[in-house]
Every structure is written in C-alpha cells, then in structure tokens.
Amino acid sequence: MGKKLKYTKFQLRSNVVKPNICMSLTTDIAGEAKLKDLERQKKGDARTVVAIILGGGAGTRLFPLTKRRAKPAVPMGGAYRLIDVPMSNCINSGINKVYILTQFNSASLNRHIARAYNFGNGVTFESGYVEVLAATQTPGELGKRWFQGTAHAVRQFHWLFEDARSKDIEDVLILSGDHLYRMDYLHFVQSHRQSGADITISSLPIDDSRASDFGLMKIDDTGRVMSFSEKPKGDDLKAMAVDTTVLGLSPEEAKEKPYIASIGKVYVFKKDILLNLLRWRFPTANDFGSEIIPASTKEFCVKAYLFNDYWEDIGTIRSFFRANLALTEHPPRFSFYDATKPIYTSRRNLPPSAIDNSKIVDSIVSHGIFLTNCFVEHSVVGIRSRIGTNVHLKDTVMLGADYYETDAEIRSQLAEGKVPLGIGENTRIKDCIIDKNARIGKNVVIANSEGVQEADRSSEGFYMASGITVISKNSTIPDGTVI
C-alpha cells in the first residue's frame, strides 16, 4: 500500500535545477485513516467512552470484611480484589478512560489502584487515565452533603464531563465495583449506539425460581424498557413475563427464562442525556436504579442489553463465600484463567508456593504460601498464607496476609506463648472466612457445631454471619479455642 510521488523537472531563469529528491515512497494516509474509521465504527470507538466505577456505600451487608476497607477493595479469588473485575473488563474492552468514585474506608482501595493501574509500574493506559475521585464537599447547599446514592455521587463530579478533556466523550459507562462477571463493555456500547437508545441497561434473563429476588423489567418487541417492578410475587410476577427472544435468546431458552432482571449499576448513557438528567431533569434524585432510570422510561429511550453469562453480586457474606468456593468447581462458572481476557491486579513479586507433604483437593492455592503436612479441601487459600502441620481446611476462604514473618520471629513468638501469622498445627476449620493477617493457634476447632446464624463476638476476634464464621482482620484466636 503506497504511492510514488514524482518530482518533475522545473526551470528557473533558464537554469535547469535537478531536485535533490527524485522519488519518495509514502503510505496512503487517507486510505489508512478510512480503514481505521471503518474499524472503529464496526466495533465502537473506545476513545469516545468514559467509565465511572462506583465505590459503593458503607457495605454493611459485607461487614466485617468492610470494617476497614471499601467493598471494591475486598479480596477475591485468593489474589485479587473486587475492583480488579470492572477494571480488567475496561482494559480488555479497550476503554482506557476511567474514574473511580470512593467514599467509605477508601485508603486500601486508593493504594491498590495506585499500585496496579498507574503509568509507571502497573498496567499502562497510553493516552487514557485512571483517576480516583474521593467524596468531597463543594459550594452550595447540595454540595455540603456526602454521597447520598449512585446518581448523587456522579452529579457531584458532573463538571468533569464539561472539561476540555471530555470534549470527545459521547457515552458514559456506569459500573459497580462489587460484581463478579466478565463483559465486553465495547460490545455493550456498540449495541447501545446501534439501537439509538439514550440509556441502555445490562440485563440478565432469569427463570421463575429466581425472578422474585430481582428487580424486573417489562420490555416491548424492540427491547425498549416500558416499566419496572421491584421483586414482584404472584400475579405481579406473572405480569412481568416477556418474550426474551427479542433480546437474542433461542425459543427454548426464552421459554425457560421469561423474565428480564437488571443486573444493577451496569448502564451506559449518552453523555448529554446523563448531564441533562442529573442537572436539570432530576436534580434532587439520589439513585439511578430506583429513581432516575424508572422515571426516564416515560421521556427517553431506555433499552435492555442481554448479558447471558455468569454474574454475581458480591453484596453479602453469603454471596461472597459462595462465589469464592464456586471458583473451585470443575469447570467453574467464572474463571480467572482466561488468557484472552485476563483479570489484572497489582504486582507483588511473590515467590512460588512451598508445599510440603500436603494434600490439596478442589481448591485454589495462591502464590507465596507455605503448606506443611496439611489437608486443604474445597477451599481458597490467599497470598502469603501459612498453614501448619496436621491442619484440615474445608469449605474455607482464607484471604491471606499483607506481610511475612521471619522464621526467627515465628520461633520467638512460639517460645513466648504467642500465636504467629497463619494457622497453627492440629487445627480443624470448616465453613469459615479468615480475613487477612489472622493468627489462629494450635488445636483450634472452628466448625459452628451449634449452628449459630448471627453473632457479634468481636471481642474474641470473630463474627457469625449467615451461619458462616468470619475471623476478623488482624485478630488472634488462642490455642485450643472451639468455635
């Protein structure tokens, strides 16, 4: 692909001057530009999209894991944090303009973002950016309040979309920071643009057994959202049944899954529409899902986008526990081991795991751990974990540690009757979440044999949530304890 530019001889005052350059070979710049434009139109231009990841509220349903951290900073899958999921989806989709809104317990989240997604040591973003926007107060009565909801949080930073850096932005992705799923956001945006929608909502087809647990949408034969119903039951539920073949399901699948649920806080807005809704149409609305979007169906074109794949809201201790253990299934419904669409996280430069005479069954074992003559069954073991001799770990999610203790420190603590990091010998643990830097002594039994569902035993270093024992971060469980 190229043109020859020929320089003809020319005459100046009867003197014939030969040019120094007789021929130049160049690329067909105009042709290449057209090809690039066609490719962007075909796939959707990621350069005109900005993503906003919501840091979430106080995370009370995930307490005590959110006692000292924001929901998106909660560790997941042995080596990741929940924020890595939407961040990686953005990277894999080619979207490199990202804002992250934070408010509660944001120190560890901010630190992780700085380490994992900066321009020097982590994932690079070329001409894009990743910026953490902490809750702040601004002049005016409304600006004196902290974030009151998803829409209020975005409204506080509406000026970003009027900034010169955002002049080419056409669409805004609104994303949650505490979901587990893998999505091509660019395909989502492309569908939004091709449909002519003002707002597009990511939706999940579901069957009768789960429909009452979700907010459902009623759509017409073009996929336009006509109405919403929050967790309907009985006749109200039956009234929300729709023909899901409209969104692309086969007739067989549509018969099994006749309901459309919003997966929550995964939206795409036209930028101008978003600004209009936040500043002028609904200036006091605090939430997208319960206020702005339902009200917008009457005036704007709101459409549903089919996402027929694994998705989990990590909003409770039970869902967090279940989603982690589901990673150990064969095959898992969600896997971090996808070479074409990897999940990124911070670089830790940890050594390989050291496993001595241990048995590991249906489990995930992260890097930098030490296992000695133990049995790990259907569990997730996080980074830098240390598990001692004759320990049996079953149905347990161990988040790992932030640092190592040296052999000398461990010997010194044992000599003084203290408990080192990790799990001591002859301990049995079942149905448990062990937060970071926990110290569990020798001959401990954690099994909730009495079936306690809820209990605050923070003075003893643990909680009971939905029947699951949660060992608090930095806590110590003494030798011989039975829970």
From Swiss-Prot:
Primary location class: plastid
Keyword Cell wall biogenesis/degradation: no
EC number: 2.7.7.27
Superkingdom field: Eukaryota
Catalytic function, reaction form: alpha-D-glucose 1-phosphate + ATP + H(+) = ADP-alpha-D-glucose + diphosphate
Expression (tissue specificity): Tubers.
Protein name: Glucose-1-phosphate adenylyltransferase large subunit 3, chloroplastic/amyloplastic
